[in-house]
Amino acid sequence: MEEMFLPLNVSATALEAQKIRMNTIASNIANVNSTSSPEGGPYRRKDVMFESYLYDESNVGVNISKIVEDERPPKKVYDPSHPDADKDGYVSYPNINTIEEMVNLIDATHAYEANLTLIAVYKDMFAKTLALTQI
């Protein structure tokens, strides 16, 4: 019986993973001009790493393996009047490309929608199967 719900578990865990990915992308976009962070220096772009898991035949899905910080160096902009300017007058800004982030957001949204569609189709198919057993 549990095997019948495996597709729902895979889609449900994928929905959660894509939600975390969308939140991470939104944070990247929101911090595009953040010149300071709690860690020191400018905000660092973050990216979500996924992994599939198979604990046993009845427990499969998608996990977030880790959230990594982008290793690209910050952008330097000459602005000696900025409070975060270094001794040479340069301010370090996050190396975030908003177009790249928007493309990633669209991709994550499509993946989220695909999993919602899969859940709806599976739910409909399961309801029709139950209806057939009632005849």
Enumerate the predicted regions with their spans.
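Amphipathic alpha-helical polymerization modules
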Residues: M1-I135
